[in-house]
Amino acid sequence: MKRLFFTFLCTAFCALYSSASDTIRILCIGNSFSWDAVEQELAPLCEAGNQPIIIGNLYYGGCSLEQHHTFLLKDAAVYSFRYIKDGVRTPHEGYSLRQALLLDQWDYISFQQASHDSGIQSTYEPYLGALIDSVRAYQPNAQFCWMQTWSYSQDAKHPAFPRYQKSQQIMDDSIQSATLALLLRYPELKLIPCGKAITLARQTKLGDTLCRDGYHLNYLYGRYTAACVWYELLTGKDCRRNPYKNADMTPQQRRLTQQAAHRAGKGL
């Protein structure tokens, strides 16, 4: 009886340890675009794919690399920090970047540029390099990522759209060029090509419908597309084989968005 009880305890402990060690922990230093990409659909995708995940998203609306860097230097408690564990999302207001960095041993930490500056290479430095150095001091073992954001809808009313001649194609090309330059400078960054996935999805029967207001992703399949990219790049699993979908999605919407995310993740 004692032997059986001991065996049970060992099995339970090993299962618990395995679950904890297998958990992926990601921290996004972001804004509303990371809100779209990781806060709603990524956790259910991971659950359906048997991948435990903890998600932290530092949200400050429209935040650029320059602003993030300034906030870190000042230890400014200005973020809304959204913490997602076991599929439960818990927001914490008045959070600082330093607090989030010290909260956990993050496996992945992602950076991104504000959408309005995403295709303008001159806005990236020296702020990204300074952020990488500063964050590395807190989390020396984390894998750093770059979340590529997406271009605006063709009819977007965003005040920064004129920077790209109000052209979705010009904005797409500018983002791709900026991303390439960034990866050449920082080859250690893991690319999360959400922007490419949205572009590919727009080239299907879905058309230019991925955004709900011209720049934020729609709730039905826009966010799902970005989350599928994250899912593939974090887990190495094919999102097309993941059974989860938003309840209101049609089979065609699911198929087209999964294909776009998979192609983007594979660089196709």
Regions found by a protein language model. Give the residues of each.
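Boundary at the C-terminal end of the N-terminal hydrophobic targeting segment
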Residues: S18-A20
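Sec-dependent N-terminal signal peptides
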Residues: L4-L16
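Alpha-helical cap/lid subdomain in secreted, periplasmic
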Residues: G94-L220, E232, R241
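A generic secondary-structure signal for well-formed alpha-helical elements
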Residues: A12, G49, L234-D238
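Conserved catalytic region of serine esterases and O-acyltransferases that act on ester linkages
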Residues: D22, L210, G214-L217, Y221-R223, ...
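Conserved SGNH/GDSL esterase-like catalytic core that processes O-acyl groups on lipids
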Residues: R25, D36-E125
